[in-house]
């Protein structure tokens, strides 16, 4: 694979949006950016990857602006970093989420109805231009692409979960589905990683430490490395 894989690392929340609040006022946004920066460093030291961060510091970025970065930079994959919370302080562990089929179907239908301009592969762009009025063909192509993306998301999530399990408890051992805005791009495979529960006393304390943040970032990096080394993933053209 000669061309580098472009990963958009999204550090959830930021600025006036603290995200979840944990033990002793621990703010999710701070955990997210620390892990994101560590992951960025690991990926940028690997010739296979190049990275873009949605934020480099404690700044607020709207969902719309985060998603615009996917289009501007021809991103191959989105990793959104978050920390979880619960009213039950005994709940702990990491998990990974991918977009639900219901949500992605809605996004595809919205695109076809609104005919908005989004960044596709050149191959798909050309097909759409040649078949402007063929709704069924466009829908079929986007459905096939979303099915392919979902397989990528599932397989990658499993690789990352394998690595996370070596360093932390898993709240959910398999990828889960949700209707999350950050994951709803019809053009880019995306996953959201909940790195642990900041409302759990022990896990919250761990998530604050550089050592534990490094372990989480390294687990994500190794999962990405293992997946893309083994897979037949083809870059957008």
Curated annotation (Swiss-Prot):
The record's listing under SUPFAM superfamilies reads: Zn-dependent exopeptidases
**Which Gene Ontology molecular-function terms are recorded?**
N-acetylmuramoyl-L-alanine amidase activity
Keyword list, A-Z: Cell wall biogenesis/degradation, Hydrolase, Secreted
Which branch of life, at top level?
Answer: Bacteria
Q: Which reaction does it catalyse?
A: Hydrolyzes the link between N-acetylmuramoyl residues and L-amino acid residues in certain cell-wall glycopeptides
Q: What class of enzyme is it?
A: hydrolase
Question: Domain MurNAc-LAA spans what residues?
Answer: 7-225
Q: What family does the Swiss-Prot or TrEMBL record give for this protein? A: Belongs to the N-acetylmuramoyl-L-alanine amidase 3 family.
What this protein is reported to do is described as: Cell-wall hydrolase involved in septum cleavage during cell division.
Protein name according to UniProt: Putative N-acetylmuramoyl-L-alanine amidase
Organism, scientific name: Buchnera aphidicola subsp. Acyrthosiphon pisum (strain APS)
Q: Its gene?
A: amiB
């Amino acid at each position: 694979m000669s061309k580098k894989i472009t990963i958009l690392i999204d550090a959830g929340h930021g600025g006036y949006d603290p995200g979840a609040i944990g033990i002793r006022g621990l703010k999710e946004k701070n955990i997210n950016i620390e892990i994101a920066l560590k992951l960025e460093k690991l990926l940028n030291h690997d010739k296979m990857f190049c990275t873009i961060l949605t934020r480099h510091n404690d700044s607020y970025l709207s969902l719309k602006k985060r998603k615009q970065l996917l289009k501007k930079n021809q991103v191959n994959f989105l990793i959104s970093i978050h920390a979880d919370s619960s009213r039950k302080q005994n709940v702990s562990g990491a998990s990974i989420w991918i977009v639900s089929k219901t949500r992605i179907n809605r996004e595809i239908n919205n695109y076809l109805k609104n005919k908005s301009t989004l960044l596709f592969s050149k191959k798909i762009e050309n097909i759409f231009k040649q078949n402007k009025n063929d709704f069924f063909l466009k829908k079929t192509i986007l459905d096939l692409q979303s099915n392919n993306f979902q397989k990528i998301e599932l397989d990658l999530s499993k690789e990352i979960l394998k690595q996370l399990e070596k360093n932390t408890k898993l709240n959910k051992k398999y990828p889960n589905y949700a209707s999350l805005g950050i994951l709803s791009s019809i053009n880019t495979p995306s996953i959201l990683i909940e790195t642990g529960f900041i409302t759990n006393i022990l896990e919250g304390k761990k998530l604050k430490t550089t050592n534990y943040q490094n372990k989480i970032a390294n687990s994500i990096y190794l999962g990405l490395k293992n997946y893309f080394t083994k897979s037949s993933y083809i870059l957008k053209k």
